[in-house]
């Protein structure tokens, strides 16, 4: 088992509140990297779409993933409930942008983005095979 698979196992064992705390820290790291290196109007929104990219691997957002997004972004100036992030991600076809970002970002930014994806996907207690496959494909 490699580093990334062990990290997935670790996040799957965390409680929801710990995952929310970790997701906040990681989303800030992703947001800050996007702010420094990408030409986007809303770096936080773009960071959220990075998370949605990993959440979308299995085709839907379950209740725990939605709750994590609500907890994470409820005090931000973004007019989307947790259950609408995935719909916005799909509606505006963020996948090509996210994949380009992941291909071109620094190693440390990629690690933060992958860990952010893991935390979101682990919020229901496990990372589904499709989510795991998407995460590990970037390692």
Regions found by a protein language model. Name each.
Residues 1-139:
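Small-residue-enriched hydrophobic alpha-helices in membranes
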